[in-house]
Amino acid sequence: MELKDIQMRLRESIAESGLQQKEIARRIGVSAQTVSKYMKMDIFPALDTFAKLCVVLDVRSDYILGIEKY
């Protein structure tokens, strides 16, 4: 899995959530600018923040990461 694939899945999940970046940021405890950086893959969230992000977006972390087999 390449970063561009993670980026695509993250962007799709955010779009499908119907939430604004500002609201996502508020719910996971970061700034809207930080969420924007996640979407551009400038930075990747810390594990605990990534877990919160997945909960807020109602998406499985293995989907975002492209993990198909364990």
Residue map of PLM features:
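A short, Lys/Arg-rich alpha-helix, primarily the initiator
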Residues: 1-19
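Short alpha-helical "recognition helix" segments of helix-turn-helix
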Residues: 24-25
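Recognition helix of helix-turn-helix/homeodomain-like DNA-binding domains
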Residues: 29-44
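DNA major-groove recognition helix of helix-turn-helix
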Residues: 39, 65-68
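DNA major-groove recognition helix of helix-turn-helix/homeodomain DNA-binding modules
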Residues: 48-63
